[in-house]
């Protein structure tokens, strides 16, 4: 098997036989656009090698938009959680199809991707979000390889922008106490309990909102994280089991939180008795006046308002989780215990997320060691 080369204008192309068509006639593949004959010969040799190993796949001539919509509807819808599917769908329809949809699958080049990432950076989109889009496209291309629409994953040849690690925004203990003091004065006791549970346990927002009374052992001071709450775009709420086995966990809680939960339970029971049958009792620890889960949007609005009112550092709700972990590590708690409380896959993940805290602790350890050595010298003298 050999290739045939020709020069057209300033570029070289080659043609090679790739097999026989169903009618017995020769099937050929032509590739062009090479600056030199040497480049064309190299590409031709690689193609012939693939054909010889029966590894050559003719790239699909379908538009990326058609293939991506098929992937979204038939593959992702059946395999992803609703929350992940909705996020993927939004990114694909709003960002990726407008960018790459008109291009045929086999004609996408690294330069297309690089230019798109540059455009997104010019729009001031974060490296984290661009990396998220990159991950979606890599996954899409991986699927196209699996169903033999392409030979290789072009997104493996392009790097997304570098993500610079930022220090987690956390509250001091003084800020926590000031915020909780303001929250406790609010008419709606639910929000105060949400913040209290999040700060004292490190639970995620969906985990706090999905807690049921049967998940809490008030006698022994334990709570079980068994499910997560998600509100779909249509406004419906869903309860799911945690993503991983480690997320499904048992968390010890202090006596002060136990007492607050007991008070909250009494207030809730009083409300249920008062409103009667209109209360849809799902057994939730945190529920609105009708018994259904608090909407995350309502929580965000309340959180932002109370931050302003209590004059504390502006953070996200998720940063309460970081605050919990940071305080534990600063107190000298073993990283494995912190990892278990947070539901991380392993302690190395916790070390990576909170490396800035452990770095400070390393410096403190070095100082303590030096002080111990000085003390030893004094004793010897």
Q: How would you label these PLM feature ranges?
A:
Residues 1-7:
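Short amphipathic beta-strand and strand-loop transition segments with alternating hydrophobic
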Residues 123, 181-191, 201, 251, ...:
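Short, basic (Lys/Arg/His-rich) helix/loop patches that form interaction surfaces
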Residues 57-60, 72-154, 165-166, 186-188, ...:
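N-terminal core-binding DNA-recognition domain of tyrosine site-specific recombinases/integrases
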Residues 127, 131, 146-211, 218-219, ...:
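Basic, Lys/Arg- and aromatic-enriched nucleic-acid-binding interface segment
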Residues 162, 166, 170, 228-231, ...:
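Catalytic-site neighborhood detector that most strongly recognizes the C-terminal catalytic loop/helix
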Residues 185, 220, 233-234, 238-248, ...:
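C-terminal secondary-structure termini that scaffold catalytic or DNA-interacting sites
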Residues 215-222, 314, 333-355, 363:
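Short, polar N-cap/turn motifs at the start of nucleic acid-interacting alpha helices
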Residues 8-13, 18-111, 264-281:
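N-terminal DNA-binding module of tyrosine recombinases/phage integrases
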